A protein has these predicted regions:
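Residue-level detector of alpha-helix boundaries and kinks
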Residues: 2-3, 15, 41, 61, ...
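A solvent-exposed, acidic/Ser-Thr-rich amphipathic alpha-helical stretch
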Residues: 27-88
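Alpha-helix initiation/capping motif
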Residues: 4-7, 45, 49, 97
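A beta-strand edge to alpha-helix "cap/lid" segment located at domain peripheries
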Residues: 61-130
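Short, low-complexity N-terminal intrinsically disordered segments enriched in polar/charged residues
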Residues: 1-24, 28, 32, 36
């Protein structure tokens, strides 16, 4: 689907909202940016992709996640069928003062509540390994 300008604004807001929800520890609000059946693929950090809002919330609530998230450089593009793609960059501040940078590749679907991320794949760009 080719996104309209209005779609692009809403999708950019949805992608950026992820960082606010994470940093506010408002995991009960994940449904504002993810679909019920969302896939969070952070396998670059080890482990398997996590599927579904409840499982993603539990995973994000576990120790070891970044303390601050900053989403930038959001680019929205056409996706297959009813989907739209977004690519953004993330800067995360880690416990102990470290920094990590990532690229997020998102698939988004329009729901009754607006655009939501149905799949997020994370690519670590710095450091090279965790």
């Amino acid at each position: 689907m080719k996104p309209t300008n209005e779609d692009t604004v809403e999708i950019s807001r949805t992608v950026a909202l992820w960082a606010h929800i994470m940093d506010d520890h408002a995991l009960d609000r994940l449904g504002e940016c993810l679909t019920e059946d969302a896939v969070w693929d952070g396998s670059v950090f080890g482990g398997d992709p996590v599927v579904g809002l409840d499982a993603i919330a539990a995973f994000m609530n576990a120790p070891g996640h970044a303390k601050a998230h900053h989403t930038t450089n959001i680019v929205v593009s056409e996706g297959p069928g009813d989907e739209v793609r977004a690519r953004s960059k993330g800067l995360s501040l880690l416990e102990g003062g470290g920094v990590a940078t990532v690229v997020y590749d998102d698939d988004l679907r329009r729901t009754d509540d607006g655009w939501r991320i149905s799949r997020r794949v994370i690519h670590l760009t710095w450091p090279q390994r965790f």
